[in-house]
Amino acid sequence: MSSVSTASLNCLPDELLVHVLSSLETKQAASTSVLSKRWRTLFAVRRNLDFDDSIISHPEVGEQNMDDVQESFRDFVDKRLAFQGSVPINKFSLIYGDKHDDVRVDRWINTALEHGVSELHLCLTSVTRRLHRFPSNVFRSTTLVKLTLGTNLFIVYFPSDTCLPVLKILVLDSIWFDRIKFSNVLLAGCPALEDLTIDQKSFPGLPNVVSSKTVKSLSIVYKYSADFDWFRTVALDTPNLVTLLYSTYARHRYRHCNLESLVNATLDLHFLENCDEAFEPNVTDLMIAVRNVQMLHLTSSATEVISQCCKGGLPMFKNLLVLVFLGNTERVWKVFLPLLLEHSPNLTKLCLESLFLILQGLYHGTDEDEFDEIHIPRSNKVNMLRIIQCQGTENELKHISHFLLKMECLQLVQVNFSETIVDSKKVQLTEDLMKLPSASSRLTMQVI
């Protein structure tokens, strides 16, 4: 920093200079303290602290030097927290790898809690955490509003007196925890919780019961197939839930699903692979639980699972207004989509994503001149149709034409071409689409 720019910044009032320093990472802000005593004092006023040891982990640093570098990092964190004095901490973020002292890390966390931290983000990876209890004070904080815990972190137990009275957002990223006490201890101790994320793509630790009367947004991503015993049943008791992202393996039974307030659901269901035991999923109760949604997004794997495993029959979706549908098998395209349309009498917006892949599956090994139209209920109320990733094949155009003739309420059709299509072909395809006949006299065609 030049002397001119330093002098210019020194003219700023304390409040504005503190704002400038707060926009820098903690280590960058610390380096400015050598410029003047005033800056050193203002640096201590920072209320957002972030420490990340990944910025010191460079390949060119040898193994012998790495211990010294990490010790230097630990000393920096110690000194910075000691420098905080009585100034409150709003946000504390710590990203720290394997080779660390759990006792010292616990002290850092407790220091942040003692300073009334409202946002705590911890990304700790440590094999020693398997035998070390996580600081229990984290689960007794009266100031935490947002808590993020990760990754590959082991939490041996939740304190019986867990109480996070103002916590609104909880994110668990690859965390091992006591699944039995997850709802009746942890969630029960979060009376203000509104947003819950459980992301366990490659790590065990998914509760088979999620129960909360306050959670409005729930995201569950779980792809750890080795944890088989916990896949037989699941319960989602969240009566005030509004938004759900559910990406995991289909279960044998959904024994209690209370989702009566749900408005928006994204389902990404998968078949359990490489399973030695007989395992037959049944998603009937799950589909019944989400039947009142207004917006439904189904991935290609979800449509496959539901088409085969909704053994009690598909419920009516009387409130469904928006449907995003993916699929790539003949059964899904010819049987499940028409059935879902019939069971969605008030649907107004339909989005078909990667239609080319769907048609590849449908027409694989058949004569492309043979057009097998998809049944569209005559009573459909769809007024907006969106086709995403259109490749402009002949069969795609035939199906789009079929939709235009069968959806009499259509007002808007949006066709998003694939990025792989050259501009000259886009021009020709746009002309072809504009010439397609329609049953609706109020139709507008948009090509993107």
Swiss-Prot record:
PANTHER family: (RAPE) HYPOTHETICAL PROTEIN, RNI-LIKE SUPERFAMILY PROTEIN. It holds the Pfam family LRR_At5g56370. LRR repeats lie at residues 117-141, 143-165, 190-213, 228-251, 290-313, 421-443. Keywords: Leucine-rich repeat, Repeat. It comes from Arabidopsis thaliana (Mouse-ear cress). This is Putative F-box/LRR-repeat protein At3g44810. InterPro entries: F-box-like_dom_sf, F-box_dom, FBD, FBL60-like, LRR_FXL15/At3g58940/PEG3-like. SMART domains: FBD, FBOX. The keyword Hydrolase does not apply. The keyword Nucleotidyltransferase does not apply. Residues 6-54 form the F-box domain.
